[in-house]
A protein has these predicted regions:
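Pocket-flanking alpha-helical
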Residues: 70-101, 216
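Sec-dependent bacterial lipoprotein signal peptides
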Residues: 1-15
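Signal peptide-directed extracytoplasmic domains
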Residues: 97-110, 126
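Exported/periplasmic ABC-transporter solute-binding proteins
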Residues: 17-58, 62-65, 69-70, 74-75, ...
Length: 312
């Protein structure tokens, strides 16, 4: 019986310590475990976001599923995850499905991304028009000579990361508006495979998210991976170097680069738990700086402190 009191005291002390230090088993905005689904085209950005979040909050564990965008929405609608990262917002019927479970999703714009067109470094073309892109995707243009009379004759092969990806959905819905000849295109498993294949196969045009090809060693984000060539895109039917733009952050901001899309965090968590905490982190100054460094455009410009010397 004499051991009872010390044992109770020890249990109370342990409980108090866990309360003050953070309970690793309790789901709060900064602790616990959650599973999220991220469109694979945003993987480089959110690998960095989750890594820093978990480094700061040691009792947090974010299990991330990098999947095609269609699968991410299915996981959310099936109640398998409470948070997804996607390039579009929920449709009305999808919101109704989630509402039927007494859940009310919040959708937050956190970044602007771009779809880059990449080719083999030996490709003679450097610019392409939106009209030509639509005709490529619609099957009207099938040969390199149709893009540029200086090109050697040969079939243009279109390459995507996955047939269910957000890139394919964006091109089909927002660019082609339904006139999308998917039979001519090839799909691999992920963006990394698209880059590797395009870098070693002339005659291919690959479609990838900009964060996959951004040169992390370039602090100004004015260059891309040297293993591939990035095409400049023009809104004009007769493109010129002066009217064509690469997916640099400045051209995402003013929408001069035409293939710009949004990045949303869609959170259906019933109360403020770890998923909600991660959403807050991504939209915070730290989270937005990670997005800025990745080569795409943060929705909120991170604060920048500048020291002004009085003697200047």
């Amino acid at each position: 019986m004499k051991l009872g009191v010390p044992l109770v005291c020890l249990l109370l002390l342990t409980t108090c310590c866990r309360f003050f230090k953070g309970d690793p088993y309790k789901n709060t905005p900064v602790s616990g475990t959650t599973t999220i689904a991220v469109d694979e085209t945003f993987r480089p950005v959110f690998e960095a976001e989750t890594a820093l979040f978990q480094a700061i909050y040691g009792y947090s564990e974010i299990r991330t599923k990098y999947v095609p965008e269609k699968q991410a929405f299915k996981l959310l609608l099936d109640d398998s995850v409470k948070l997804i990262v996607a390039s579009r917002q929920l449709h009305a019927d999808e919101i109704s499905t989630i509402n039927s479970r007494k859940l009310f999703p919040k959708q937050l714009l956190v970044a602007l991304d771009a779809i880059a067109l990449i080719v083999h470094p030996s490709c003679k073309d450097s610019i392409i028009s939106m009209k030509q892109i639509r005709e490529l995707l619609g099957g009207k243009i099938t040969d390199w000579e149709q893009l540029n009379s200086k090109n050697e004759k040969g079939t243009v092969r279109l390459l995507f990361d996955n047939e269910k990806s957000g890139i394919v959905a964006f091109l089909a819905d927002s660019v082609c508006r339904g006139n999308f000849a998917v039979g001519r295109a090839s799909a691999l498993h992920n963006s990394r495979e698209v880059i590797e294949y395009t870098a070693t196969h002339p005659g291919v045009i690959g479609f990838v998210g900009t964060s996959w090809i951004s040169n992390s060693n370039d602090s100004l984000h004015l260059s891309f991976h040297k293993k591939i060539k990035v095409l400049s895109v023009s809104e004009y039917d007769q493109p010129t170097p002066e009217t064509s733009y690469k997916p640099y952050q400045a051209y995402l901001l003013d929408h001069r680069y035409p293939l710009t899309r949004s990045v949303y965090l869609i959170n259906a968590e019933p109360r403020s738990g770890l998923s909600s905490g991660f959403v807050s982190f991504v939209s915070s100054d730290k989270g937005q700086r990670i997005i800025l460094k990745s080569g795409i455009l943060p929705a909120v410009a991170p604060a920048r402190v500048v020291n002004i010397r009085p003697d200047l």
